[in-house]
Amino acid sequence: MNISMLERKINRENSYKLKPVSELKKGDKIPLVSDTMFHVMINNSSKKKYSAYLISLVLGLEYKEVYSSLIFVNNKLDREKYKDSSKTVDFVCRLNGKIIGIEMNNNSTKEALERNISYAADLYKSKMVSGEKYNYETVLQININNFTFEGNNKIMEEYSLRNEEGEEFTKKLKYIHIYLPNIKKKCYNKEKLNVLERLLLTFNEEENLSDITKGDRIME
């Protein structure tokens, strides 16, 4: 019997370790897996080039097109609409009629991953207005995971609603998972990295950055 990815054991080998603030020394690099650094580098309109570059690489789009079209939006989900406490997602933007959410996942509990599903569903219904015609927008939820699942060596994979034959039910709700430990492992094994993998390493690694960023005007 097939076991769903969410039901598998979590593998934290090669994950990035976060130092407590009290242990940080002058000159220490804070990796992107830190909530603080994620908001500084990605959820920050003054550093739009980084979020635009990341999204363009994940979705296979032209960087200039993404940069010119990307619009930052409020990342707090309205508690009155959902009869729940206010929930904040790490990053939300609009891009050519789509809503894109990005979550940086350090918490590898099943409950945390279930929340990721809930966030995307909430974004999907976020434009419903009582008494008016329903307007469901396309939502892409990108999860950058500081862990992987047992037996999963993939760098990135996409999930959507499909039947047992693999036919897609809708294109309006998709989940993209990226596994940082598998990128790190690929780098340590001296395998050639693509641009997305190099970017994510640049955000998190402390050493050999010049080799990773060489030739990329945005990363440099």
Regions found by a protein language model. Give the residues of each.
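Elongated, amphipathic alpha-helical interaction scaffolds
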Residues: 1-220
